[in-house]
Amino acid sequence: MKKEDLRIVYMGTPDFAVESLRALVEGGYNVVGVITMPDKPMGRHGSVLQPSAVKQYAVSVGLPVLQPEKLKDEAFLEELRALRADLQIVVAFRMLPEVVWNMPRLGTFNLHASLLPQYRGAAPINWAVINGDTETGVTTFFLTHEIDTGKIIRQKHLPIADTDDVETVHDALMAMGAGLVTETVDLLLDGKTDAIPQEEFYKDVAELRPAPKIFKDTCHIDWNQPVKKIYDFVRGLSPYPAAWTELISADGKRMVLKVYQTEKRPATHNFPVGSIHTDHKSYIDVAVEDGFLRLHSLQLAGKKRMNITDFLNGFKQIAEYTVG
């Protein structure tokens, strides 16, 4: 079968999913429909509806778009069947019921932003950086009942530099993933479906690192950790959702401070953990057990993100605070 004859339905929502859809469209593949989330209410009263990034791109290139509230809704399933997909591709969408993923004759494959079976879950890019990994990647795998556990089709590897954050890794994986999606489609077109069970990639489930969804409390900095761990934690949450701490005044008042960019400075010292040290002009150092974390980019609640010089210009009393 030629790629022009293979009927593909694409499912995705955020920016990460746009690149793979673009690669399919610009590569001449036959995308017959796009499934994405319903438009989200925006504005003060929810009066403005914001379409997903995938919908915006799909509409711009004239692709049919379906936006079901419920994936088991019979009206949606009828519309999906009418597209007569040979293959479905999922990138950053949502968990599919079997009635959806089992519909096409070639099945449904997903692009996941990790080297499965590592980092199954909602936030694989964040956790790879938070854990200080030096490598991650992208995986295509066939969907099955349990989330992120299906047979692996192909993988590509990406080194993580010590200076990378979630944004840089996200963007690199987004581009790499688009290439892997088209490569996977080509393999399936050629009849090469030698997918490998994930169980062959590990001996014990204890070896596997999860990637659970990240909540606000997850992002709270623990200053009792070693400086390297805190440094990785910050870059693993930067720029979104952002690591945060509290500035605590001498009288116990607290202000939330988001931290976006730091520098680790190992050292031996006798300062209390969480104490702040500054020249009031060019740097802020926070003492931790094995050195200092130098803060480079910050944001107080209700304020814009600032570099350290601008922050110090507007916050002269910073040395009177601690963090916690």
Question: Model-derived features: where do they sit?
Answer:
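N-terminal Rossmann-like dinucleotide-binding module
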Residues: M1-H45
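A residue-level signal for conserved active-site and pocket-lining positions in enzyme catalytic cores
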Residues: G12, V34, A58, Q88, ...
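Amphipathic, non-transmembrane alpha-helical secondary structure
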Residues: V18, R22-E26, L77-R81, E98, ...
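Donor/substrate-binding cores of folate-linked one-carbon enzymes
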Residues: G27, L87-K213
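N-terminal beta-loop-helix "entrance" segment that forms/cooperates
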Residues: K40-V61
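Internal anion-binding site segments
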Residues: K203-G324
